[in-house]
């Protein structure tokens, strides 16, 4: 059986849970406490040197990490229902969408981390913070922890992050003029990749933008996504829930 090391609120973890649910793949769940730094322990880093979640342990014991890599592997090995277009050009378009969304994760962190990690990080002494940061393999995440602990994002920075996320909705709106889904005529990994972002935009960051008035095609897409059985199974719940 697969083992998934993940977090309920982690955007990347949500992507993989959505893919697993769409495929009907059962797995053993292991929750990682990001605020406690469990993903930076020597044991975890031995499995995933990037020190991020999710981490998927295959039935044969091998490890996979990075959500887009995991999801493509799952679609390769469990091809039904297909979550990648059959046409090579459309598959390339799908990967472009996933890459585009990945590049905007920093804008989401501005809002997501203040709900948990920032509250823990702010209470650390300078020595404790230095020790915590020392264990983080990514310089980008080291800087994010330092910001969360000692220099919270300003209203201006939040405004800029919000603006960039709304631009993502604009791009979606334009793409959806050709059909119900982002790429081709089927729900794909492109849609799965962006679901965690739209969820957060809708519930807190810019809910007035995910409406029939502002982005009607995105609004219809979002209703269709939430109606899929896999959405409930993947537990994409409000961020403010424990």
What residue ranges belong to the model's regions?
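GST-like domain detector, emphasizing the conserved glutathione-binding G-site
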Residues: 1-137, 152
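Short, conserved loop/turn and helix-capping segments at secondary-structure boundaries
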Residues: 38, 87-91, 212-219, 225
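Short beta-strand(s) of the beta-wing in winged-helix/HTH DNA-binding folds
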Residues: 54-57, 182, 232
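A late-sequence structural motif
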Residues: 228-229
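Carbohydrate-binding/catalytic loop surfaces
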Residues: 239-242
